[in-house]
UniProtKB/Swiss-Prot annotation:
Subunit structure: CpcE and CpcF associate to form a lyase.
Function according to Swiss-Prot or TrEMBL: Required for the chromophorylation of the CpcA gene product.
The protein's name: Phycocyanobilin lyase subunit alpha
Source organism per UniProt: Thermosynechococcus vestitus (strain NIES-2133 / IAM M-273 / BP-1)
Family designation: Belongs to the CpcE/RpcE/PecE family.
GO CC, one annotated term: phycobilisome
Length: 276
């Protein structure tokens, strides 16, 4: 067939680690922001050992960036760099991420708290606990802003991931916080830290909430903590199938790690089949 009159279709651009590293270290703030995201998501797929080290080093440096600031004083590049470092799994980033917990930008603190939970380094426990000082009375909305004074939801979840049993007394009062999402985070973490089913059942009851967003949040928390008694309720919950799949995958992964009896894992596989 002749090519006359047809529009040429260009080949998709194949981005590379060296290109993205150069972009991250450039001067265009929007390109740097994108590069941080890209390196966190795709950077390790093709990177050499030397490139992996360069990625981590460049992202750690980006945590101290001063060039990319919003009108309200936020640091978008720092946020993306923290998120990327959490995904990359290199504990070299822990000291710099701990320092980010002191950043004036709420969303940098939140991203750093999540990343520290993902990295699983116990050095983060005490600094994370410090953000809960003042308890529920401190955890109030900032006037005129859509967030609390501190990212307590992210902090509590990360303390659960880190197995920080020393934080149980700090976390327990947040079960009575005015925001359901914070209550859910506390229940999830306390289940992870104690194994007490009362916390899992609290989230299970939230699947009956009239608010679909709260149902989604509770469902994902149940999946993340691997709460097997919730499997059937998750299948019946009034949320989209995509959320149910994520939650059941989480429970299945936890059961496989614990070498659960075959009949339990089989029922989870059957539940997943129903959703596919």
């Amino acid at each position: 067939m002749s090519g006359e009159g047809m529009t040429a279709v260009s080949e998709p651009v194949q981005l590379t680690v060296p290109q993205m590293l150069a972009q991250l270290q450039g001067t265009d703030t929007s390109l740097r922001y994108y590069a941080a995201w890209w390196l966190g998501k795709f950077g390790l797929e093709t990177a050499t050992a030397a490139e992996r080290q360069a990625i981590v080093s460049a992202l750690i440096a980006a945590l101290a960036d001063e060039a990319d600031r919003t009108e309200l004083g936020g640091y978008p590049l720092r946020r993306n760099a923290a998120r990327a470092l959490g995904k990359l799994g290199d504990r070299q980033a822990v000291p710099a991420l701990i320092e980010c917990l002191r950043c004036e930008d709420f969303y940098v603190r939140e991203a750093a708290a999540i990343a520290l939970g993902q990295l699983g380094d116990p050095r983060a426990i005490a600094p994370l606990q410090s953000l809960l000082e003042g308890g529920v009375a401190m955890a109030r909305l900032v006037p005129g802003r859509p967030h609390l004074v501190q990212p307590v939801e992210a902090v509590i979840e990360s303390l659960g991931h880190l197995g920080a049993t020393e934080a149980i007394a700090l976390i327990e009062p947040f079960l009575a916080h005015e925001m359901p999402r914070v209550q859910f985070a506390a229940a999830r973490a306390l289940f992870q830290l104690t194994g007490d089913a009362v916390y899992g059942d609290r989230l299970l009851a939230a699947l009956n909430s009239e608010d679909v967003q709260l149902r989604r949040t509770a469902l994902l928390d149940l999946g993340a903590m691997g709460y097997l008694p919730a499997a059937e309720a998750i299948l019946q919950a009034g949320v989209e199938a995509s959320f149910k799949l994520i939650a059941l995958h989480g429970i299945l992964g936890q059961q496989l790690r614990q070498a659960a009896p075959a009949e339990q894992t089989l029922s989870l596989f059957q539940g997943l089949d129903q959703l596919l």
